[in-house]
Curated annotation (Swiss-Prot):
This is Glutamate 5-kinase. The gene is proB. GO terms for biological process: L-proline biosynthetic process. PANTHER family: GLUTAMATE 5-KINASE, ISOPENTENYL PHOSPHATE KINASE. Belongs to the glutamate 5-kinase family. It is found in: Cytoplasm. Gene3D superfamilies: Acetylglutamate kinase-like, PUA domain. It catalyses: L-glutamate + ATP = L-glutamyl 5-phosphate + ADP. NCBIfam families: proB. Transmembrane segments: none annotated. InterPro entries: AceGlu_kinase-like_sf (IPR036393), Asp/Glu/Uridylate_kinase (IPR001048), G5K_ProB (IPR041739), Glu/AcGlu_kinase (IPR001057), Glu_5kinase (IPR011529), Glu_5kinase/COase_Synthase (IPR005715), Glutamate_5-kinase_CS (IPR019797), PUA (IPR002478). The keyword Membrane does not apply. Its main location: cytoplasm. Pathway: Amino-acid biosynthesis; L-proline biosynthesis; L-glutamate 5-semialdehyde from L-glutamate: step 1/2.
Amino acid sequence: MNLSEIGYRRVVVKLGTSVLTSGSKQLDKAHMVELARQMSALMKAGVEVVLCTSGAIAAGREHLGYPKLADTVANKQLLAAVGQSQLILAWSQLFSIYGLHVGQLLLTQADLHDRERYLNARDSLNALLNNGIIPIINENDAVATNEIKVGDNDNLSARAALLCHADLLILLTDQQGLFDSDPRSNPDAKLIKQVVNIDDSLRQLAGGAVSGLGTGGMATKLEAADIARRAGIEVVIASGHRRQVILNAVCKEDVGTHFTALENPLESRKQWILAGQAAKGKLVLDVGAIKAVTEKGRSLLSKGVVSVIGEFDRGTTLQLIDSDGRECARGISRYSAGDLNKIVGKHSDEIESLLGYDYGDAVVHRNDMVVL
């Protein structure tokens, strides 16, 4: 492989707990040093690397001698608080072997939801990269509550890729990639080597497999891949135990499942809407509204809303769905759930008389919307 001819200039590598522990209950330092070697080789070849690492809770369990704790949020936070220091120490020591420094960024959903904090996180990330320091990103599980759930770091790595305008996102797991059926139950399952479009049939293939120590499954990796590719970022899902896997992926060799980036990626603000904010509610749209939004690029009007799901304030990101629950778009609502329930199915010129005020004709303006 010729690192001097690499087309990528900035790469995000996500390592799952199953990769870091090699299926055991503790961090596999021998394997971690091999992964650090590959990332260091990229840095020295002029490719900037961002590492999104899981493993804090597993490291905490190991450091405390595998205590028998109830499976509660508080205990997960305890383990994460203890383990995060051990995890960053391990990575710092391993990268120092190759003369590289690391910097730690612990993020929560709130850091990505607020536009100003989102931009500040981006500036911190870029400052580290511009000074030849490897940013190491993890979910701030010690203070987060809702974030300790399936898929946090898969989605976090995609958001990190958007933050730093990466060219490639590598999601390393204990599977070779995405298969046409579950390879653990079907020995004839075939690896899908190339994905151009992510649709419902592909999401069904991803299933919901979850490793014993981690929190991510193939379904969440598919979600992360979809976020990244919409921003013009290529994605590879591959086995973290394959020899030279990071270098192979960056050199575009035949490894894992490769997801092609969209030719016309979303502009920066819409990337933030899609990746920076968690949807807090849903609007069910009629057929006409779905066509107007998805095919004609129009704003969503109250007339096209059939029903409101959830409680939320104005300025909240919502999922726009059809009658079968399929999401067709995501956008920022100009009205609260309480207001929307009063104007559902009504014409825009009736809003002020019904509410006593209005925030514009559109419930979700097209500039605040991402069509999926």
